[in-house]
């Protein structure tokens, strides 16, 4: 984007594309199997996207049946975005909705936590939530089974076992 806007040529830049695993998928795997069917990712960083747009996106997806991966939930300078996100989610989702938190995925300080939507706003001041954290918000079918988040695909009602 910057190269193009400055009149540069892509041929002048030597680069290599290395396929990877998105943070939401990596974090979802650490939590169990919460990201099946439809999933939406929303960043709470307002450095390049105005908070009004972020709120509008949250308002659009919160009442739907998506699981939601939230990136960049908290920074030292930007705390109110996380609180506003929690308010919007609580307007549209059950307070008992399972929440998975992964701090520092694949790093030495990796930490995971399962909680519920009602408790999530209280965790904003805790060390587990910062810019290296990904939060997975379950949908109306998500549940916790043996310390794992599970969003069923519906096989148990479709097939006779």
Can you say where each PLM-predicted feature lies in the sequence?
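Class I SAM-dependent methyltransferase SAM-binding "motif I" and its flanking Rossmann-like core
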Residues: 1-64
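A contiguous loop/helix-start segment that scaffolds small-molecule binding in enzyme catalytic cores
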Residues: 63-161
């Amino acid at each position: 984007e910057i190269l193009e806007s400055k009149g540069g040529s892509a041929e002048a830049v030597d680069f290599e594309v290395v396929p990877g695993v998105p943070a939401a998928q990596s974090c979802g795997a650490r939590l169990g199997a919460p990201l099946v069917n439809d999933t939406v990712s929303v960043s709470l960083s307002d450095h390049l996207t105005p908070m009004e747009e972020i709120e509008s996106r949250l308002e659009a997806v919160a009442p739907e049946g998506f699981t939601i991966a939230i990136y960049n939930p908290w920074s030292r300078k930007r705390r109110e975005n996380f609180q506003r996100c929690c308010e919007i989610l609580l307007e549209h989702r059950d307070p008992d909705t399972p929440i998975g938190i992964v701090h520092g995925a694949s790093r030495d300080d990796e930490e995971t936590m399962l909680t519920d939507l009602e408790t999530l706003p209280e965790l904003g001041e805790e060390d587990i939530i910062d810019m290296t954290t990904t939060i997975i918000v379950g949908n109306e079918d998500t549940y916790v089974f043996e310390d794992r988040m599970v969003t069923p695909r519906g096989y148990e009602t479709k097939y006779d076992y």
